[in-house]
Design a protein with these regions (language model features):
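Non-heme Fe(II) oxygenase catalytic core, chiefly the N-lobe of the double-stranded beta-helix
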Residues: 2-166
Length: 166
């Protein structure tokens, strides 16, 4: 078995994983090493992985039960897969503001497994990530104390599928 490499990309968040072929069913030790890297670095990525929808689903399933987004259109044959596409004719770009996927649900998924298949010819289309652990640690002790123990209410708004439980 080829050794997995974990290379941090910033001091606070993100690591590149190498030495693994996501098209294959992974050994439990490999899944555990990837899970550890994810927990430590919060965002992980794998280069040069040409996956089908089925392989994408199979990889993600090794980390837990998959979620079907209640408000976003999904692939007709794979409800766990959301197709996000924008081009020069698009009137709106999905996810263009800071957000965390599906946090409006009572039990949101622990994470998202993204797969990029096409990039804009001009090099745009960046996806940015931020560490909320680092953001919290950068707060003053007084503000941390103010926030500790508080609960946030995340709402989806008036989109189809949004719940407004009191």
């Amino acid at each position: 078995m080829k050794a997995i490499t974990v290379t941090p990309v910033t001091p606070r968040i993100g690591a590149e994983i190498g030495g693994v072929d996501l098209r294959e069913k992974l050994a439990e030790e490999t899944v555990e090493r990837i899970r550890e890297a994810w927990l430590e670095h919060q965002v992980i990525f794998f280069r040069d992985q040409d996956l089908t929808h089925q392989q994408h689903i199979a990889f993600a399933s090794q980390f837990g039960e998959l979620h079907v987004h209640p408000t976003v259109p999904h692939h007709p044959d794979h409800p766990e897969v959301i197709i996000i596409h924008a081009d020069e004719n698009s009137l709106q770009v999905a996810g263009d503001g800071w957000h965390s996927d599906v946090t409006f649900e009572e039990n949101p998924p622990v994470g998202s497994v993204l797969r990029l298949t096409e990039t804009p010819p001009d090099g745009g289309g960046a996806t940015l990530f931020s560490s909320m652990y680092s953001a919290y640690e950068a707060l003053s002790p007084a503000f941390q104390e103010f926030l500790d123990g508080r609960v946030a209410l995340h709402q989806l708004g008036n989109l189809p599928g949004a719940r407004h439980d009191e």
